[in-house]
Amino acid sequence: GYTAGSLRLLAERTGASKAGGWTDYASLDIALRDDLEGQAHRAMAVIDPLRLELVNWRGVFGDAAIVPCSAPAHPQRPELGTRHFGLGAALWIERDDFALTPPKGFFRLFAGNKVRLKYGVVVECVGCSQDSAGRVTAVQARVLPDTRSGTPGADAVKVKGTITWV
């Protein structure tokens, strides 16, 4: 659905006329985005999931099944608070965030490359699993110790890419 504010914003932007006219449908989506920008809480989602297995989980986090993480509910409005979620040994990433043979300028996950899991840790890809058709079914990565977001020394390892996960 659309918020009342977004419909008002669309009407304000397009105006009214006695003559017939067309308004691009994308204008409604833009008005909705602009209306929700200041008030909607943020979250992460993965549309086309690919399993990410953190192979050295126990070595870094011990017997902890889940490590707590947090992020601002809205990046520009700290008064909206913080959201909490857990990081575990098996996660889901966007399939497009991994490449067997990366093109030039690809800063996401591929063999030997390091990326930050958004609001999480830095991981380095060590391999992947494929089915009989050659489709990637899982990616294996190792966690780099002491790189958890929000902790001292978290930015000691420089990475070029940050990816979304659930």
Identify the residue ranges that each predicted region occupies.
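Catalytic adenosine-cofactor/nucleotide-binding cores of aminoacyl-tRNA synthetases and other
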Residues: 1-166
